[in-house]
Design a protein with these regions (language model features):
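Alpha-helical support elements that line or immediately flank enzyme active sites
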Residues: 1-11, 134-140
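Non-catalytic C-terminal accessory modules of carbohydrate-active enzymes
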Residues: 15-200
C-alpha cells in the first residue's frame, strides 16, 4: 500500500492519499484502526470479507504511512546515498493539511522540515545537516522569492521553483497560488471513488 500512497501523490492526487490516511470511514487506514487492526488487511473490508480470502497480517499500518509521511508530506527525499544531498519536496497541494513537523537523523546530522500554510501563504523552516546540500522546491513561480544570498535559484519545475541550498537553518515565507490543488486531474472523480467504486 505504501506504493499506492506515493503513486497517488506523484499523480497529483495527494488529497486522495490523505483521505485514505486520515478518514475513519470505509475504505481507509483509519477504518482498519477503528476496527482494531494493527497490521494492514489484505482487503479494505477485512472485517467482513470471507476469512479464507483475506489475510489480516500484512505490513504494520504505520509502516506504510510513515514512508509516505516522510517522503511526500515532510518532503525528505535522498538525491544521493545517505542524504549527502537532500531533496525537500513536500506536497503542499493537500488543502485539508495545514501543517507538518518532521525530523530525521542522517549520517550527517538531523534534517528538519516544519511547515504551515494557508491557502495563500507558506511558512517553512528547514535544517540541512553539515556537509550536505539540498534542492528545495517552493510552491511559487517567483524567481526572486528567496532573498538569502546563500540560496541560489536553479530552475522552474511545474508550479514550483527549485533552489540550491547549503547546510544550515533556513526560513522560507512565500505566497502561494490559492488554486494549488483545486484543479486535480487523473484517476477517478472523488464522488465515484467514495460512492460507487466496488472496493473489496
Amino acid at each position: 500500500m505504501n506504493w499506492m500512497m506515493r503513486e497517488l501523490t506523484r499523480m497529483g492526487r495527494g488529497d486522495v492519499a490523505f483521505l485514505l490516511a486520515s478518514n475513519k470511514t470505509y475504505p481507509s487506514y483509519g477504518y482498519m484502526i477503528e476496527k482494531g487492526a494493527t497490521a494492514i488487511w489484505e482487503l479494505w473490508n477485512g472485517d467482513t470479507a470471507n476469512r479464507w480470502m483475506n489475510s489480516c497480517n500484512h505490513v504494520m499500518i504505520l509502516g506504510d504511512l510513515l514512508t509516505w509521511y516522510f517522503r511526500d508530506l515532510a518532503g525528505f527525499n535522498p538525491a544521493q546515498p545517505a542524504y549527502k544531498q537532500i531533496i525537500f519536496k513536500p506536497d503542499f497541494s493537500i488543502q485539508e493539511l495545514s501543517y507538518v513537523k518532521a525530523s530525521h537523523n542522517t549520517l550527517y546530522g538531523k534534517m528538519i522540515s516544519n511547515w504551515k500554510k494557508t491557502l495563500t501563504h507558506l511558512e517553512w523552516d528547514i535544517t540541512i545537516p553539515c556537509n550536505t546540500t539540498a534542492l528545495v522546491y517552493l510552491p511559487t513561480l517567483d524567481e526572486k522569492a528567496v532573498k538569502d544570498k546563500d540560496v541560489t535559484f536553479v530552475r522552474r519545475e511545474g508550479n514550483s521553483t527549485v533552489w540550491s541550498v547549503p547546510s544550515g537553518n533556513y526560513h522560507f515565507s512565500v505566497s502561494m497560488d490559492p488554486s494549488l490543488g483545486k484543479n486535480r486531474v487523473g484517476i477517478v472523480e472523488d464522488q465515484f471513488l467514495y460512492e460507487q467504486a466496488s472496493f473489496p
